[in-house]
Amino acid sequence: MKKKTLLPLFLGIMVFLAGCDYSKPEKRSGFFYNTFVDPMKNVLDWLGNNLLNDNYGLAIIILVLVIRIILLPFMLSNYKNSHMMRQKMKVAKPEVEKIQEKVKRARTQEEKMAANQELMQVYKKYDMNPIKSMLGCLPMLIQLPIIMGLYFVLKDQLVDGLFKYPHFLWFDLGRPDIWITIIAGVLYFIQAYVSSKTMPDEQRQMGYMMMVISPIMIIWISLSSASALGLYWSVSAAFLVVQTHFANIYYEKVAKKEVQPFIEAYEREHNGGSNKKGKNTQVVSKKKKK
């Protein structure tokens, strides 16, 4: 359910980002602007003007990295919960599927409630929390207003320094640049690919769709926006690629280690009887030989 809601959410956000406009002074008001956009504008202006000697390209890079580092604990918690849930589900899947079949075959409300109660017992047995899994989108929702605040600062060029000192590397921060646009699109493709590698098979199609849709939307918006926006997206995507890659490696090991007792308990429960039977069969065959 969580994965199915991500695509409409992502598309809705992209439409919102493309449609909002704070470029005109009379539109610079309201809760979102005052809470998220204006503070980002002031921080970026202070970084570029006072700390970095009018180097606004470097100011954008530093601000994106600082925001991503601040949000890192939320993202790491999401990675950990996702890996734990996936590893536990591998063990619990046979039991869960049997009970889900009971729910489908239930003819009365009482039978359905009994099957659902049985399902909750399985979740409890393997220390699985479906509600916690459903809240996996929460870290993303927490970070969105902050990231979107910086997005609008760059999209609508609200910092005067971007006009006065626009040159950074090979491009003009105040104008569209095809190369930084391509870099942003490629990095978001890689980021979606890295994320999809750890998805279960039934959810992987969603990851493949994101691999196509997100770069197209990024390129489409960047081609008609200041290259400062492409720089922002490139740095953000590069950070996410590294973050996702190493977090997946680490938390997959952690999850497998923590789930091992459940696997051993499952094997004892389901293979214990057959092992005893096998031993008895061996004893009987030895007696016959004698």
Curated annotation (Swiss-Prot):
One of its GO terms (cellular component) is plasma membrane. GO terms for molecular function: membrane insertase activity. It comes from the Bacteria. It is a multi-pass membrane protein. The chain crosses the membrane at residues 56-76, 134-154, 176-196, 207-224, 229-251. The keyword Nucleus does not apply. Keywords: Cell membrane, Chaperone, Lipoprotein, Membrane, Palmitate, Protein transport, Signal, Transmembrane, Transmembrane helix, Transport. A lipid is attached at residue 20 (N-palmitoyl cysteine). Residues 270-290 are annotated as: Disordered. GO terms for biological process: protein insertion into membrane; protein transport. It is found in: Cell membrane. Required for the insertion and/or proper folding and/or complex formation of integral membrane proteins into the membrane. Involved in integration of membrane proteins that insert both dependently and independently of the Sec translocase complex, as well as at least some lipoproteins. Belongs to the OXA1/ALB3/YidC family. Type 2 subfamily. HAMAP family: YidC_type2 (MF_01811). This is Membrane protein insertase YidC. It comes from Staphylococcus aureus (strain MRSA252).
